[in-house]
Amino acid sequence: MKPSAECCSPKFWLVLAVLAVSGSKARSQKSAPSIGIAVILVGTSDEVAIKDAHEKDDFHHLSVVPRVELVAMNETDPKSIITRICDLMSDRKIQGVVLADDTDQEAIAQILDFISAQTLTPILGIHGGSSMIMADKDESSMFFQFGPSIEQQASVMLNIMEEYDWYIFSIVTTYFPGYQDFVNKIRSTIENSFVGWELEEVLLLDMSLDDGDSKIQNQLKKLQSPIILLYCTKEEATYIFEVANSVGLTGYGYTWIVPSLVAGDTDTVPSEFPTGLISVSYDEWDYGLPARVRDGIAIITTAASDMLSEHSFIPEPKSSCYNTHEKRIYQSNMLNRYLINVTFEGRNLSFSEDGYQMHPKLVIILLNKERKWERVGKWKDKSLQMKYYVWPRMCPETEEQEDDHLSIVTLEEAPFVIVESVDPLSGTCMRNTVPCQKRIISENKTDEEPGYIKKCCKGFCIDILKKISKSVKFTYDLYLVTNGKHGKKINGTWNGMIGEVVMKRAYMAVGSLTINEERSEVVDFSVPFIETGISVMVSRSNGTVSPSAFLEPFSADVWVMMFVMLLIVSAVAVFVFEYFSPVGYNRCLADGREPGGPSFTIGKAIWLLWGLVFNNSVPVQNPKGTTSKIMVSVWAFFAVIFLASYTANLAAFMIQEEYVDQVSGLSDKKFQRPNDFSPPFRFGTVPNGSTERNIRNNYAEMHAYMGKFNQRGVDDALLSLKTGKLDAFIYDAAVLNYMAGRDEGCKLVTIGSGKVFASTGYGIAIQKDSGWKRQVDLAILQLFGDGEMEELEALWLTGICHNEKNEVMSSQLDIDNMAGVFYMLGAAMALSLITFICEHLFYWQFRHCFMGVCSGKPGMVFSISRGIYSCIHGVAIEERQSVMNSPTATMNNTHSNILRLLRTAKNMANLSGVNGSPQSALDFIRRESSVYDISEHRRSFTHSDCKSYNNPPCEENLFSDYISEVERTFGNLQLKDSNVYQDHYHHHHRPHSIGSTSSIDGLYDCDNPPFTTQPRSISKKPLDIGLPSSKHSQLSDLYGKFSFKSDRYSGHDDLIRSDVSDISTHTVTYGNIEGNAAKRRKQQYKDSLKKRPASAKSRREFDEIELAYRRRPPRSPDHKRYFRDKEGLRDFYLDQFRTKENSPHWEHVDLTDIYKERSDDFKRDSVSGGGPCTNRSHLKHGTGDKHGVVGGVPAPWEKNLTNVDWEDRSGGNFCRSCPSKLHNYSSTVAGQNSGRQACIRCEACKKAGNLYDISEDNSLQELDQPAAPVAVSSNASTTKYPQSPTNSKAQKKNRNKLRRQHSYDTFVDLQKEEAALAPRSVSLKDKGRFMDGSPYAHMFEMPAGESSFANKSSVTTAGHHHNNPGSGYMLSKSLYPDRVTQNPFIPTFGDDQCLLHGSKSYFFRQPTVAGASKTRPDFRALVTNKPVVSALHGAVPGRFQKDICIGNQSNPCVPNNKNPRAFNGSSNGHVYEKLSSIESDV
């Protein structure tokens, strides 16, 4: 190889000398290692530029200094290149090569790859063929290229298509190496992209065949896509384009995109290449040859420097191209790692494993009509920047073809055109949007390189454009105008969208473009697709709330009707119904009504109804009558509707009312003379539009004034309106209406609800005299005809604030709206009036018939209830006797007389004289075989022969005092009622209830079976009548009184009593809280505390009654009271005492003298302050006397009592309230204090007797000062006691101490200390609750040892079952206890007064059976001979002793202290609250 003349020139050697001198100087100055690098320039290259590039001091900072060898050569054949490089290695000891050529031969790259692999020398191809794409490099090669890889170029080609929305394409390749990589890269990219790519064809052309063009033509004819990607060499591309041109694939409508391999040298362009060819090439404009040489030297030097820094050596120079040693291989591989990762001057110059740059500088070039390559885009940092926002469709000059691809300009203005950014993930536009280009104006860019970014457009006009393009069948490129707005002629030149169309840069202009005459002169407009004009927008002003806004929900008529119905109608109606109701407050139906009690006034009625309107937020008093309750309930429903309607409608009137400053139009004074207002009225518009033109042509002064207030855009104008910088904005009506509808907070409105001035329309601007106008007009008219235009208007032009006031604001509720509520109140009043009339008719006329009084048979209500019960339980109804003849019948079943009867019963229990004497009662208790009905405590006596006892005759005035009490109570009763009472008592000795006997008398009735069931009696208020005897009569004193206790409340002797009345307001509070405790606490106790029991009368009332009777002077026993039908009523009471056939006479004992003396003593005791307990001291004289013994001998009526019994009875060591024995009281003390021993209580009774911290047994406070008797007589009536001052004072002090029943608190505490039995109530659902430990356990099982009452002797032998807790009972068909002593539903005589006095009302007689009293406490065995000891204690003139009950006396049944303690007398242990009215307090 001969050196060229250029290489031997003096200039060349001068350069080498300079380099040598500089290198030696550097080595002398700094002993740094150097590396030899050969720079080979093939072809024509600028040596001076290269010299300037590597002579700079840019590499002095590196640890290795480059030693550059500049070589120029012209030969490009492989042999010359190989020889020259090998000579340099052997002569110059080079360690790297940088090669640049100006050819398009990709073979040079292949030669360099071969040399590098053989010599293990790094070679860099920086330009020309050496930098072209090369596939399948040698693995040991260190050949690197300044150029993009195949994959990188394929990615850039896809980005170009995506930029212009070219999604449909095909691929054409040859068998040139790397085609498979190219196709695979395209396929993998489109498969993993969000863009909707569509690859139609992939053609592989075999260029080695010599069969002509026919085969290639046939293959190219398959292509139908407008975009074609070509991969081949430059020579192959020349032939392919020639064939493609012959088949029409290079004309208008087809775009070819090729890599840099096809473009090659940009200075030579083959004639076969079509105009508009796009190529991806290495940047030749910004990255020239000198910069590449410099970077090549820097890459090798930097890599060697990094290697020296880490390993302290650099590769040794190569002396020959042959015989490579292993050490050289190791050093070269190590240097290769540093060459791949190089950063120089902050630029990343790294290479990939394939030897291509990681970040190449690429450009997109276009072959223009001048047949020159034009740079139209740049790829930098994986971002594409294109010059043309619409791709120029370039075609040959000779081709005349109709253009169906249009360039369209638009303007951003919502809602007609809305511009958005592309999707950040896919980089494309989403659905229902159209790609549009937006130009970026920058001062740093030249006019030749404008920047554009891709945007997405949508809106009303865009949807119209899409529909028109489908109908007319054309494609388009959309871009946004930048030089102006809609278009205005300035100095004879149009700008904006009109200017783009006039300059023919766009075929059409679509947007909010108003049609006017000036624009129509230069462009053609389509028919208007929307009507518009000029409108004015203002800001709403904040109003104030009216003071009467709270009244606005209802009209004045509704408010008037509200108060009329409340004050006049509803309140008055409730008051009248309540006042005249049978159970109202002001109806004095009972004498016991408290004076000054509550009354339901008209004011309370108004207050009640007014409180209901506001949800009972104030304390009110509720009515009691049924009619008034109905009226109040309906009013409550009315109040709910009224208040809910008011509240719901109030929100619409309480919000701020907004007012709009009205402007009549453009001729308004505020527009024509704005300075006349203070402050001046400010208004403006957007310049360069049809609105400004219209104002300028019609209102010159207005146009001159508004110039300083004009806005740059609609958004700026809206902001100025909200901030107060602008008072009115004049613009297109369509745009303003949309903005007003979409305004946040709806603060902006158009005057006159969108009033339009200078009406016109929006149209599409088309180039003048274009053939597209007619087709576009027809397409728009078709949209109107199909209704699609209305759909688009509803979609885009309707805002949320449109008609807002009509939707939110509610109208006033007039009388028609509220008429239904007032109709409801009227109907309620009518119904209440009918109910009121029916209530009175039933109460005064039909009530007795329903209760069976009229027919004498069971009432309808009773029959229905008993029939249902019988069907369920299989109990037959036996109507053998009239229900009114039953002993359980009542004298009057009305609630109105209950309180009167209760008071009468108490008065009768406290009567003086004959009625208070126990003598007559004792006459009946004979020693013969008579049976006293102790179970029901009635005067029902029979002999063993089932014959009734014949009462002896009585005196005429026997019941005068008693009848006077009855006359005072029942004086107004009709005659038929009296007959009912008399018939009732005639059958009293043989009582029968429906289906069974209700007395022990039935057990000895020869006509009845020995044992029958006892179904529940009628639910009435039975009234059993007992008659007191005369003072001198031989008849017994009738103990029984008017009992108001029904069958359901009579119970076992040992058990706690249930309630005493059937009154619905009575609520039993059971003392036993065992069992289902949770249920009782939540239901029974809770309900009992809410309701008001009948027996809970005010203690003050009882105290007044008792004190009144104490103050009454004693009446003469002969005092007569005359009343209607007195003789018949006397016969009614005397009938029971007349002697009957076959009955033994009773022995009469005259105790007149005893009671006479007692009467005198009582008078003296009452004067001296003797209490009710001290008068019992007359019965005992000294310590040697027995209790109840006259002269040391038992009284005649106590002949059968044994001494043991008398000791137990009279010992005085038992509590007066319970059978507990008092161990701390001896017989001696008891004998000395016999007058007080009846009042002694045990500690438990003392504790339970406290009521609100008031001691019940105040008489025990003076027990430490006993008063012994001073005289002893054989007759009890002559006993005298000294009245010491202390004792008299104590008696006087204790005289007014009124005893109280146990309160709820003490009762519960008592139950906690001493457990009581289970409650007396039971129901089917509580069956399981009472299976154990309950008197009702016998209802579900039959013990084997139960004996029946089939024989007569069972009366005296079966009595031990009565008090034996472990005894069982025979199972019967009834749900109630079999024995009358166990039945809690049988009424008793005298229980009413015992309820009031707290005493026990049972008379006991000691049985004649020997040892019976000593062996067991047989209750029935005690019937015959038990004396009424308390009768002697209570012999008080003028009234009964209120402690006449035997519960205060000694009980022969010695109790077990472990058993439950009995309560005082017949006190049932319940809590009775005050009863202020009789009817149900529901």
From Swiss-Prot:
Disulfide bonds join 86-321, 429-456, 436-457, 746-801. Keywords: Calcium, Cell membrane, Cell projection, Cytoplasm, Cytoskeleton, Disulfide bond, Endosome, Glycoprotein, Ion channel, Ion transport, Ligand-gated ion channel, Lysosome, Magnesium, Membrane, Metal-binding, Phosphoprotein, Postsynaptic cell membrane, Receptor, Signal, Synapse, Transmembrane, Transmembrane helix, Transport, Zinc. A motif (PDZ-binding) lies at residues 1480-1482. It comes from the Eukaryota. Residues 1074-1097, 1162-1194, 1266-1301 are annotated as: Disordered. Residues 1266-1277 have a biased composition (Low complexity). Residues 1-26 form the signal peptide. It is found in: Cell membrane; Postsynaptic cell membrane; Cell projection, Dendrite; Late endosome. Residues 577-603, 624-630, 838-1482 are cytoplasmic. Residues 1290-1301 have a biased composition (Basic residues). GO terms for molecular function: calcium channel activity; glutamate binding; glutamate-gated calcium ion channel activity; monoatomic cation channel activity; NMDA glutamate receptor activity; zinc ion binding. The record marks 615 as: Functional determinant of NMDA receptors. SUPFAM superfamilies: Periplasmic binding protein-like I, Periplasmic binding protein-like II. The extracellular N-terminal domain (ATD/NTD) endows NMDARs with a unique capacity for allosteric modulation, harboring several binding sites for small molecule ligands that act as subunit-specific allosteric modulators of ion channel activity. A hydrophobic region that gives rise to the prediction of a transmembrane span does not cross the membrane, but is part of a discontinuously helical region that dips into the membrane and is probably part of the pore and of the selectivity filter. This is Glutamate receptor ionotropic, NMDA 2B. It comes from Mus musculus (Mouse). The gene is Grin2b.
